[in-house]
Amino acid sequence: GSSGLIPFGRT
């Protein structure tokens, strides 16, 4: 998920 500070695979 890209719903964080950095668009990783986590939320």
UniProtKB/Swiss-Prot annotation:
GO cellular component: extracellular region
Broad class of the protein's primary localization: secreted
Tissue specificity: Expressed in abdominal perisympathetic organs and abdominal ganglia.
Record carries keyword Cell membrane: no
Subcellular location: Secreted
Modified residues (Threonine amide): 11
Alphabetical keyword list: Amidation, Neuropeptide, Secreted
Record GO biological process: neuropeptide signaling pathway
Family membership: Belongs to the periviscerokinin family.
Function: Mediates visceral muscle contractile activity (myotropic activity).
The name this protein goes by in its record: Periviscerokinin-1
Organism of this sequence: Blaberus giganteus
Lineage, top ranks: Eukaryota, Metazoa, Ecdysozoa, Arthropoda, Hexapoda
